């Protein structure tokens, strides 16, 4: 459970931001810097600039100017009525330095942090102040009721495929914190998804996962993740966030984003490179072994990065002797990533000796020596371009007798090693280690002493800036070099939960173009799958059922023997069942009227349970999410109504009935025939009525059409249309369906036929009641 009362939580989880964010770091193209406080008064030495509140402890000055000629000028804040040095607090400059401002600033963007323990509520003014002459060079007043930006808590995710989370936090304008996220990982093409409006559509945009990847999502079980919106996209551009199956256009669960959220700008929007907020030191250059860290309150977040061989570990720890790097007695963390599963590990070790752990002696996990002594919390792990990256948290203080404290007031001697894991997934003797004294000041101002990740750039101020810090040069960086985890701006002491004062603010003015795609783009086609081992599903012949009534319901795809093997397309978990059969091929005759009783769901607010039935010449389905040029190429024969304005509305809509597998039974892959699998299914229906559509194929109907879902792709299969029903044309191979009695009301309501359009055939629809028993839809009489 995320401890929201912990003040440093924002920085802590900021380190988990997408690991590849630096690759796309660049100039921000939108003018949002937080809440504007005002302009600096122009008093002396050319001081000017616009001052913004980034969050409770951070000030941003846009286009700051100062001639640099005064002998002792500093940034100051105070709580007196007007600027003075009485009781005022001096700020570090934008580089973390404490020296006076002796260099010239010309239209430079400057970000400053308030002293520890102070917030904007505690001060009344900000000033450029000269100590030597006690002169105010320029200042701005801080309003007592200043509504500074802060993270905002919104709703939690709830959806299908096990999608869930705790309440999501909008950390800043480009960062989302999703606590305790879960997803079963069973869909083939699920992505994190954002877009305009309140509901997701295929017009939206995928966003990278917590490791910066856009691959289909794997299984998550209550994992807290941080996601970064790509490029210049911000929360002001989007109306929802969720999980979306891109190939099948299915919403697995989403939340709406309230308008006008008062959140901080991201680091990129302020032109700040992520590594400027992190510490980094190279431990072993040959394997690109680095340690990155940030102190967060009473704890420290550490990220280890190395190019490891399979089944190897990297370790980092504190020496028991402050004067030498001593392995024996050290408190270390051993970390690695399993390249097969992607799972990461970070284990608390006590190095009692050089031997492998045996009987609590040697290099042992703390828990092998004493129970409940693992003081390490794994936050994230990933494999990126062959680099193992593990992020963990531990307390600065020692929490048990096997731990050593980490000082933030001086240098600590550290130890590190790389080596193979043994059969017990514990350390074997190291292959590489530090042979000389290596000391680190963990409490220093952030300093990046590592090669810059590919694509990283410095502060993106105007070309007129002078005296900017030189960019770090990389000897080992380059293509594929691992990115840094990105912390957020200084931690806030609180966040909003969508209180009234946090909403209804005007979002920042944006340029006309945004990163959201405004035109429908092609939906990716799932890769073909192996059709070997497909179940034999009996076709529904043209002479059956005698009354021409088909019952269309939802059910499982049947694992590797079902939908994928039958059609050659990947399924996303559900398919149409016609008269109890999994996507059977249907044979019909021109000139005969057929009735489809549809029970695929009728609540469009839950897209994963809303499957309007329709018939067209399109083998894919999902008409609703096609681009306009794609729609023009599709002819629909049944299941829609077209209004005079041209709006196409599905009419094959009814309550949801679902063939449900036995959760205690074997998986579908274990069944050798559909008949055996079908006997384990139970039909479960929601309250309400089915929908009914009628269809009469004619001489203009192609020989092959398809039944599908109007809102999702790849849920149905083929309908073969014949001129007559004889043994050759109709494919008579034995009965596949039973007759089912239906009872229409005495005065059934018949909809007006849809206006005929060149791409749409008219059809009539009726609503009716059914007289179904629990075993209405039994499998055909054909023996299995």
Curated annotation (Swiss-Prot):
Its main location: cytoplasm. InterPro entries: DM13_domain (IPR019545), DOH_DOMON (IPR045266), DOMON_domain (IPR005018), Spindle_Org/Thrombomodulin (IPR052126). Residues 287-419 form the DOMON domain. Residues 1-28 form the signal peptide. Disulfide bonds: none annotated. Pfam families: At5g54830, DM13, DOMON. One of its GO terms (cellular component) is polytene chromosome. Transmembrane segments: none annotated. Residues 34-143, 151-258 form the DM13 domain. GO terms for biological process: cell division; meiotic cell cycle; nucleus organization; spindle assembly. The keyword Cytoplasm applies. Residues 451-491 are annotated as: Disordered. Interacts with Chro and Mgtor as part of a macromolecular complex forming the spindle matrix. Chro colocalizes with Skeletor (Skel) on the chromosomes at interphase and on spindle during metaphase. Provides structural support to stabilize and organize the microtubule spindle during mitosis (within embryonic somatic cells) and meiosis (within spermatocytes). The role in mitosis regulation depends on the Ran pathway. This is Protein Skeletor, isoforms B/C.
